[in-house]
């Protein structure tokens, strides 16, 4: 595989992980992908983004983006659970990992390979 292929694969695996930490970094990396930066440079940008402490807003934004994969296939109970979990997260009743575990369950149930291959759903966080 050529370096560009590795860069695209890396971004597929990391984009929601980056978005969880920082929308600004996400946008910056998306723009950088339109240039001729090397795999090493993109990896460094991703690593730097993952050092940023996620905010409530960044977690909710990433959750909403990933939830979009299920909007049409989720049943009513799952839709309600999604709203409840997001509200509980905003109010400090649950942590980020609980939201991600819910999305991982749906990704498995509905076989959403793009999300299943995303590192954000395969990385356990401190509670």
Whereabouts are the PLM-identified features?
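Acidic, Ser/Pro/Thr-rich low-complexity regulatory regions
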Residues: 1-127
């Amino acid at each position: 595989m050529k370096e560009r292929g590795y860069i695209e694969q890396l971004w597929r695996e990391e984009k929601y992980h980056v978005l969880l930490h920082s929308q600004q970094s996400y946008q910056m990396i998306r723009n950088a992908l339109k240039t001729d930066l090397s795999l090493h440079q993109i990896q460094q940008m991703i690593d730097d983004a993952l050092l940023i402490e996620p905010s409530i807003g960044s977690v909710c934004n990433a959750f909403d983006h990933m939830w979009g994969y299920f909007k049409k296939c989720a049943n009513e109970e799952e839709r309600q659970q999604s709203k409840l979990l997001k509200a509980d997260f905003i109010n400090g009743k649950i942590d980020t990992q609980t939201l991600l575990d819910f999305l991982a369950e749906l990704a498995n149930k509905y076989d959403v390979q793009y999300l299943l291959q995303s590192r954000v759903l395969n990385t356990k966080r401190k509670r």
